[in-house]
A protein has these predicted regions:
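Polar low-complexity intrinsically disordered regions
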Residues: 1-68
């Protein structure tokens, strides 16, 4: 099962499409730079995408909307 759950994540982010976009960008950053917001042992997930979702859930990643 996915941790954190999609229902919990949608309380933080407005839409599932925005969530996918944010998580994909952050997971690529983690993969390329090997820089994490938390200690390695504090993550539940082993892969970058799951870790990016954990960071979103914990509020470590902020979403700033641009006005068009």
């Amino acid at each position: 099962m996915l941790y954190p759950s999609i229902d919990k994540l949608l309380n933080v982010v407005d839409s599932k499409y925005m969530l996918v976009h944010i998580a994909s960008i952050r997971s690529k950053q983690m993969h390329d730079t090997n820089h994490y917001q938390m200690n390695e042992k504090d993550y539940v997930n082993k892969k970058e995408l799951g870790r990016a979702l954990e960071e979103v859930d914990k509020g470590l990643i902020k979403v700033i909307k641009k006005d068009n």
